[in-house]
Amino acid sequence: MTEMQPAILALLAITAALGLLVLAVVTTTAFVKVSVVLFLVRNALGTQTIPPNIVLYAAALILTMFVSAPVAEQTYDRITDPRLRYQSLDDWAEAAKAGSQPLLEHLKKFTNEEQRRFFLSSTEKVWPEEMRAGVTADDFAILVPSFLISELKRAFEIGFLLYLPFIVIDLIVTTILMAMGMSMVSPTIIAVPFKLFLFVAIDGWSRLMHGLVLSYTMPGAL
């Protein structure tokens, strides 16, 4: 039993690390906004389970990896700096600080200032005095929730705009069915083909994916 304890502890540590990695991917990258927008579009189309959840999550993950590639590369370059020795806890702390800087800049770039001010001021009411003494608006504890809420807000703004043309189709179809005395026919059955035709005609998936990617354009980029 004693011989197995190190292996069990290592397994627990790896599992915990993977869990934290998943949490970081969801809360500090484009994954939240992209996935929410994709699911809102599916709901607006009225196709319910088409595309399947796994397809939408895969698409969201791929777009997230594409958008986050510069941050990942900068982080890798910093933590593999030959000047970092990794021989003491101070060395590891220095590497963690250097490696987190690109992510910190990414969060600051796409975080709403109002949210940052709210969470910073909330520390005075929620956190004990010793914890809030040195906190700033650029700390991860402030940036991560601010970024998450900012991304959710932008996702629902995009979803609202995407919903409008499909709602118009629903209203038109419902009105026509009522005028024809076909109130027993579900408008959804008739509206979905027209929604799909409109979405395909305007190359909806390409435009949607392109728009989501370009919403993370670097300042000053063409």
UniProtKB/Swiss-Prot annotation:
- Keyword Lipoprotein assigned to the entry: answer is no
Q: How does it sit in the membrane?
A: Multi-pass membrane protein
Keyword Magnesium attributed: no
Query: Cellular location of this protein?
Result: Cell membrane
GO cellular component, alphabetical, reads:
plasma membrane
Key words of the record: Cell membrane, Membrane, Plasmid, Transmembrane, Transmembrane helix, Transport
Q: What PROSITE patterns does the entry give?
A: FLIP_1, FLIP_2
Single Gene Ontology BP annotation = protein secretion
Q: Which Pfam families match?
A: FliP
Please give the InterPro entries that the UniProt record associates with this protein.
T3SS_IM_P, T3SS_YscR-like
Q: What is its main location?
A: membrane
Bilayer-crossing residues are: 6-26, 52-72, 158-178, 182-202
Q: What does this protein do?
A: Could be involved in the secretion of an unknown factor.
Q: Which family does it belong to?
A: Belongs to the FliP/MopC/SpaP family.
Protein name (record): Probable translocation protein y4yL
The scientific name of the source species is Sinorhizobium fredii (strain NBRC 101917 / NGR234)
Q: What is this organism's lineage?
A: Bacteria, Pseudomonadati, Pseudomonadota, Alphaproteobacteria, Hyphomicrobiales
